[in-house]
Regions:
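Conserved class I S-adenosyl-L-methionine
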Residues: 2-3, 17-64, 169
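Class I SAM-dependent methyltransferase SAM/SAH-binding core
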Residues: 69, 75-119
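A short acidic, Gly/Pro-enriched loop at the edge of an enzyme's catalytic core
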Residues: 118, 122-130
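A short glycine-rich, Lys/Arg-flanked "PGG" loop and its adjoining helix->strand segment in the class I
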Residues: 145-157
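Conserved beta-strand signature within the Rossmann-like core of class I S-adenosyl-L-methionine
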Residues: 158-165
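Short, glycine-/aromatic-enriched active-site segment of Class I SAM-dependent methyltransferases
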Residues: 166-183
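Short alpha-helix
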Residues: 184-200
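Conserved S-adenosyl-L-methionine
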Residues: 201-212
Length: 231
């Protein structure tokens, strides 16, 4: 279920002014869940072939040195790590202080901010790509709709929106995820794809998978990956 200034090549901080505002993470239910899970989450999902395929497709579509926003960046791996290794400029945002600290250590080439993306300004056209891997599921449905529209506007024309979710029809359902209590909202596959269209993003690739997290409390979950382009 569901990424401070990083050093540039010269050793100086990269110029990353896309998201002004002070860091403000922690305190939310999602932060509590992922603070508790920490590196366990990365280990549980490390074998996801579908996530890797999604990242490979994204890399193939990005121009060199692209600016990428990673929403719900977690430990920084695999998303920020893969993008940074390819020379892209990555800004990760995550509500979990534990996850953000792990990411900063594991991917020092990227910048990570501990904050709730819903509270951050998202300047129009600031990014070449935005990744949202499984980071919407603890938001209410209307919050997901609104955030995807804001994220789409933060893309330059022709920019790429990449998202993954668990495609089930659920609104405020109490569940247990890797031993942690969560409240989940999501959309079925067709409804989720419709959110892209509503946001002005044309879906170019869609992939469904079934994944079992490598964790004692892991259970099979359907996964949906969408890649789209802003009109």
């Amino acid at each position: 279920m569901g990424d401070s200034q990083g050093p540039g090549d010269s050793g100086e901080p990269r110029d990353s002014q896309e998201l002004p505002g002070a860091d403000a993470g922690g305190g939310s239910p999602a932060a509590a869940v992922f603070d508790a899970l920490g590196a366990e989450y990365e280990r549980a999902f490390a074998a996801s072939a579908a996530h890797r395929e999604s990242l490979e497709r994204l890399l193939a579509d990005l121009a060199p040195g692209s600016r990428v926003l990673d929403v719900g960046s977690g430990t920084g791996r695999p998303t920020a790590r893969t993008l940074a290794d390819a020379g892209h400029r990555v800004l990760g945002v995550d509500v979990s202080p534990v996850m953000t600290a792990l990411a900063a250590r594991q991917v020092p080439e990227a910048e990570f901010r501990c904050a709730d993306v819903r509270d951050l300004p998202l300047p129009e056209g600031a990014f070449d790509a935005v990744c949202v891997y499984f980071s919407l599921l603890q938001m209410e449905r209307e919050e997901q709709r609104e955030l995807l529209e804001r994220l789409a506007r933060s893309l330059r024309p022709g920019g790429l929106l990449v998202a993954a979710t668990v495609p089930v029809d659920a609104a405020g359902v109490d569940a247990v995820f890797m031993g942690q209590p969560v409240r989940v909202s999501s959309f079925g596959a067709e409804e989720f794809a419709a959110l892209f269209a509503r946001a002005g993003v044309t879906v170019e690739w869609e992939h469904s998978a079934l994944f079992i997290p490598d964790h004692p409390a892991g259970a099979p979950e359907p996964q949906l990956f969408l890649h789209g382009r802003r009109s």
